[in-house]
Each structure stands twice: as structure tokens, then as C-alpha cells.
A protein has these predicted regions:
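C-terminal cap/substrate-recognition subdomain and adjoining C-terminal extension
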Residues: 96-119, 123-339, 347, 355-356, ...
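Long, low-complexity, intrinsically disordered N-terminal extensions of eukaryotic proteins, enriched
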Residues: 1-9, 14, 46-49, 312-315, ...
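Long, compositionally biased charged/polar accessory segments in the mid-to-C-terminal portions
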Residues: 53, 346-347
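Low-complexity, intrinsically disordered regions enriched in charged/polar residues
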Residues: 30, 41, 54, 58-61, ...
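Alpha-helical substrate-recognition element adjacent to the catalytic core
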Residues: 2-152, 243
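C-terminal accessory/interaction regions of large nucleic acid-associated machines
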Residues: 353, 363-367
Length: 392
């Protein structure tokens, strides 16, 4: 296992609620709420048309394309820095109820004995998300989003992270295993299902469109909860209807995060179910542990009986062929107790069938292993070693 900074499994169940950002928590693309207007002469739609055209022309990731265009259009117009991007983020409008949603849901979970963690998984800009009031108030456990690398003056010089609709899913696995650092290869380590910090059944994914489908599908297939949201002002449900028809989401609701809304009621119901279900899961894994212990004990008992039967058969062997067959079965056994080793040593000295063929390859290998397992030096082991050395 790698030297991972893995978060340990909690004593209480953890429910991870993962959100897209644009049109999920905010009514519009974050870049279109002040930034594009300040650096681009055309309308917002034209900005995206040009950005997508550049991506198509150069076979470029669409997110890299918009990040490049943001920097390019800013030249000679504004000083683009990390701070200015966060300032633009502070202007981003949020859907009703979002401001107090995260802490309110966290407190509801606490009442039910469930730890609630909120995560952003977005193709938008991390810097702008971090500039929002909710992020500054500590709403998010982790923000996974596209971001820039900056020089010592805070000016963007290169993309640091690009999150697109296909690689979004890796962050769900990071959350599942508690390996949150984007560069930590520990996400690839194997963990038994009962050791997952946040099993997929305890992951909620909330999104609005096709770019969320891979995450929604992954969560759905693994027993989690995927929710499609739509703008309550336009009441356009075409996208959520399509996602529901394609089995991408289990539920849909207006993007209204106020107390008592459809979404609020739905998420609280999921929290209630999580609290009850984790009690059952805990009992299941206790039963599984007891079953494994019993199975191992049974295997040990069967193995011990099998070894005794082979020792008795070897002691009574009356032909070389039978002896070789028995030794072949014994070579498959990895562990022998000291008492069993003593019995086997006595047989080698007393049974002429065994003693005579000690120099045969299979018998020789077996008895060398027995002497090593026995680990004691006495007259009997000395005699066996002499017989093995002399080929007699």
C-alpha cells in the first residue's frame, strides 16, 4: 500500500453529498456572471461558441480551451490574477437557500447520527468557486475543479488541474476511500468494502446536465443516490426527464435549497435512510466477521484431520508407489506443528519403505522442509540429515 494520507473510517456513517456547480448551485455559468462581460466584446454565447470552436479545431479539451480564452481575452483589459478570479467568484449568484443549505443539512445529519460532508466536483474554475460566500464560510470538505498555476505575482501561467465530464468520476473513488489529495496514488490501493470510508451507497450526486452523467451513472450503479435539478424559474425539465428516462438519476427536483423545499425533503429522507441502513450494514459485517472466523476454524479443523490421516497412511505405507503419492499430498501442506514433525521424523527412521527412498527427490524435499519446520537438533534429526546426505 502506498504512503497515503488516507482519512480513517469514522465511528459514525459518513454521507458525502457531491455537487456540480454551474446550474446546480448557481443559475448560470460562473464565468458568465461578470468575468466574460468585462473582457469580451461580444455576447456570452459568442464567447462559448469561439471557445468550443477552438477546442474542435485543435482537438483540445473544451475546458482547456475556455481557460486559455479567459487568459487571452484578459490581456490589455484587466489584470487577471488569482485574487481577481476569486473576486469575480464573490459575485456569482446562488440558487435560493444555498447560502445556509450546507450547515443546515450538516446539522440535520448530526441529529440523526450521520456525518455530512459536502464536495464540489465541477468543470468550472476552482478559484471562482473559492471566492463564493459559501466556500469562504467553509461549506465544502473539498473542491475538485479546474484551476490555474500562478507565478509569484498571482498571475496565471499554466493550467494546474482540468476537470472534465469523464475524469470527474475519479474524485468519487477518492471520496469513497478517503484519499482526497489529487496526486495521491493511494486511491488505487485495494481496500475491503467494509473499510471504505464512504461506500457508494452513502454518496449523493447532485447535477443538472449531460456533463454529470458519468458520475450519476457510477453512483446509481453502486447503490448511491443521484439527483437531477432544474431551474425553478424556467421549469424546464427536459434534461432531468431525459436523465431519468436513461436511468442516470433516481430523483429530480427544482434547484431550490430552502428549508422545506422538495430537494430539502428528499436529501433529509436520504439521511434518514442512511442512518437506518448503516445499522443494518454494521450488523451484516459483524455477522460476516463471525462467519469468516468460523469458516477459518473449520478449515483449520479439516486441515488438522487431513494431516493426521496422511501421517497414519504414511506410517502404514507398504509400497513405494503409495509412499510417493502420500508424500505428494503432504507437499501441498504449508504448515506442520512440532508434534506432527516429530511423528514424521519417527516414521522416516522406522518405516523401511520411507527410509529407503529418502534420497528420492520428492521425499528428500519434503523431509528437508520438515526438518526446517521442526527447528530442533537432536539425535533423530541428525540421523535424518545423515540419511539425506548419504542417499541411504
Amino acid at each position: 500500500m502506498s504512503a497515503t494520507r488516507r482519512r480513517e473510517k469514522e465511528d459514525k456513517p459518513v454521507l458525502a453529498i457531491c455537487y456540480d456547480f454551474d446550474k446546480t448551485l448557481s443559475p448560470d455559468d460562473m464565468q458568465a456572471q461578470g468575468y466574460i462581460q468585462s473582457v469580451y466584446d461580444g455576447d456570452v454565447a459568442s464567447f462559448w461558441t469561439e471557445s468550443n470552436g477552438m477546442a474542435e479545431k485543435f482537438e483540445m479539451d473544451t475546458n482547456l480551451a475556455y481557460m486559455y480564452k479567459m487568459v487571452d481575452e484578459a490581456r490589455g483589459r484587466i489584470l487577471l490574477t488569482k485574487d481577481s478570479l476569486e473576486e469575480y467568484g464573490s459575485r456569482v449568484k446562488l440558487f435560493p437557500g444555498v447560502e445556509d443549505w450546507f450547515e443546515r443539512i450538516r446539522q440535520y445529519g448530526k441529529q440523526k447520527g450521520v456525518i455530512i460532508e459536502h464536495y464540489i466536483i465541477s468543470s468550472g474554475l476552482k478559484e471562482m468557486i473559492q471566492g463564493t460566500s459559501v466556500a469562504k464560510n467553509g461549506a465544502f470538505e473539498k473542491v475538485y475543479a479546474s484551476s490555474f498555476m500562478y507565478d509569484d505575482k498571482g498571475v496565471p501561467i499554466w493550467p494546474a488541474q482540468v476537470v472534465n465530464y469523464t475524469n470527474k468520476t475519479q474524485f468519487l473513488f477518492r471520496i469513497e476511500k478517503g484519499v482526497l489529495d489529487v496526486n495521491d496514488s493511494g486511491v488505487n490501493d485495494y481496500f475491503p468494502p467494509e473499510e471504505y470510508r464512504v461506500p457508494f451507497r452513502n454518496i449523493v450526486y447532485i447535477g443538472d446536465s449531460d456533463t454529470d452523467i458519468p458520475c450519476m451513472k457510477l453512483v446509481n450503479l453502486n447503490g448511491g443516490h443521484s439527483i437531477g435539478v432544474y431551474n425553478n424559474d424556467t421549469l424546464d425539465k427536459s434534461k432531468v426527464f431525459k436523465m431519468f428516462n436513461d436511468n442516470r438519476i433516481k430523483y429530480f427536483a427544482p434547484a431550490d435549497y430552502t428549508k422545506g423545499s422538495e430537494l430539502d425533503t428528499l436529501v433529509k429522507a436520504i439521511i434518514n435512510r442512511t442512518a437506518s441502513n448503516e445499522i443494518l450494514e454494521s450488523i451484516h459485517y459483524e455477522c460476516k466477521g463471525e462467519w469468516i472466523d468460523n469458516r477459518n476454524d473449520s478449515k483449520k479443523s479439516i486441515s488438522k484431520r487431513n494431516k493426521i490421516n496422511l501421517i497414519i497412511a504414511l506410517d502404514g505405507s507398504g509400497s513405494f508407489a503409495t509412499t510417493h503419492n502420500i508424500i505428494g499430498d503432504m507437499l501441498d501442506i504449508e504448515e506442520w506443528t512440532k508434534d506432527e514433525c516429530e511423528m514424521l521424523i519417527d516414521i522416516a527412521l522406522q518405516n523401511s519403505q520411507v527410509k529407503y527412498i529418502l534420497h528420492d527427490k520428492d521425499v528428500c524435499i519434503f523431509y528437508k522442509c520438515i526438518l526446517e519446520s521442526y527447528g530442533q537438533h537432536n539425535e533423530k534429526t541428525k540421523k535424518i540429515q545423515e540419511l539425506l546426505s548419504n542417499g541411504q
